[in-house]
Structures are given as structure tokens and as C-alpha cells.
């Protein structure tokens, strides 16, 4: 490997800012940034020594050896198509869902193309900065650029995994399930606490230790051993009580609860704590329509 490349960023949102700051701290030369929002570019440049705000994406590409496209996914291809790329330069996007195929214009001009997706959540810039070191990074690139990206991941203290283009959508769907939909589940859970008089922030605070404990159990015990609760132990009576309470007080939450409980049955069976008979009873219970005719509640159709 030769000297570290001069890096530039097109896009100065949470991902770009966190990645630029972490790479700068790791000894990389971050020389330029351009963004549709000039204030965001100025904020990024102010936190990375030696980084200049440039007026256009083309100016960044002209100055840098390796350009990170850290725009929203739906803007990547448009940005790349609008740049005249130098042969031998490199362009990398940070989308988790899209492959390097969207960089075909740059590749046709002789640029190396790749993707580097941090498997991490970026709710705000400072939290992203704290979360990024040590994360998993999905890498897709051809050989020379691949080696550069693997070195970048190593320098960030991360763990690299390599994906084929056709694997990206499933990989990203898994990330969405774990990260984004956990937030949705917390919203649904706190909705129930609102029903018995709590404010949402207090409910979140009360439930967070349980969430952290679950994550700790998954880390320590793995799957399916980390599963606990009424489905895991075949507690049909408790599930019946839950369903009745939800049908009465929170019918909007009931379909999600039932579907998740059904999806939990094979996990509990694999753990060995749920008998086949109890699994059958729960499956029948969870498939039952709990809404009276004409109530307008959601009904299972499968």
C-alpha cells in the first residue's frame, strides 16, 4: 500500500460528517467537502483540520484521490453522473442498500468504484461520531480500491465484511429490522404506557434497561438462548390476557403483537422451552379474531 489518499466528501450530513471526522482523527488527509447545504459543509470543514469547502462536487473530484459520496441514496447516481472523473481516481458511496452499479458512469470514465457502508445508526452527528469506531463496515469494491477500503476500516478500528452486489438489499433489510424497527417497537410499547398515565419520555426511560438487558443477553447467550417471556415458556394464559387487554385498550397495537408472537414461536421451539402442544395452542390463539363484528378492528387474513 502506498501513501494514504487525499479524501473528499460530497454530502455533509450525519454520515459524511462522522466519517470525515473519524478518518481525520485516524490520520487521513480530508482536503475538501461540497454540499447542497453550505452551512453543513462549513460545519464539517470546521471540525476537520485542513478541509476546505468547495463550491461544486466537480471541484472536490478534481482535488481528491478518493471521493466519498455521502448524500441521500436517491441523489447518489445524479451526483456521480454530473462529474467528469479522472482515470485512476476513486469514488465510493456509503449506501447500505445500493450496489456499486449506480457508479457506472464514473467507472466508464476510468475511475475505480466502491461502496463502504457503516453498519451503524446515525440519529445525530455527535452520537454517530461516538458510535462509529468499532462498527462493522460492508465493503464492495474491486482489488486495488478494495485494499484501500479494508485499510480504512482497519484504521477506524472497525470490522470489515465483504458483500456481492446482489447481497446488499438483504443485508440492508436486516439492518433496518434491527435498528429502525426497534425504534418502532419502543414507540408501540410506550403507547401502551400512555394508556395507563405515563408520559412518553418517562416510559422510554423505564423501558430502556429492559432493552439493554435484552441486547446484553443476545451478546452473551446468542440465539435462541436469549429468548425469554411467555411465548418462550408456553404461557398461554398470559398471552390470552395480553390479547384481551390490547383488543380493549390498544387495538392498533394488537396486529403487531400477534404477528411478532407468531414469529417468536419457532425461536422458542428451537430453544427447547416450548412444547409442540403449547406451540399449537398459541398458534391457534394468535390466529383467532379478537375483534367483534362491526368493531372496525384489524383482522388477520392468514
Q: Which residues are covered by each model-predicted region?
A:
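Conserved dinucleotide-binding and phosphotransfer motif residues
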Residues: 26-27, 63, 109, 156
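Rossmann-like NAD(P)(H) cofactor-binding subdomain of soluble oxidoreductases
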Residues: 38, 48, 52-127
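Interdomain hinge/lid region at the active-site interface
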Residues: 216-274
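NAD(P)-dependent dehydrogenase/reductase Rossmann-like domain
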Residues: 268-302
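NAD(P)+-binding Rossmann beta1-loop-alpha1 motif at the extreme N-terminus of oxidoreductases
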Residues: 1-59, 88
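Internal alpha-helical scaffold of NAD(P)-dependent oxidoreductase catalytic cores
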Residues: 43-47, 128-220
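Hydrophobic Val/Ile/Leu positions in short beta-strands of Rossmann-like dinucleotide-binding domains
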Residues: 7-9, 69, 139
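Short phosphate-binding/catalytic loops that engage adenosine nucleotides
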Residues: 28-29, 111, 158, 198
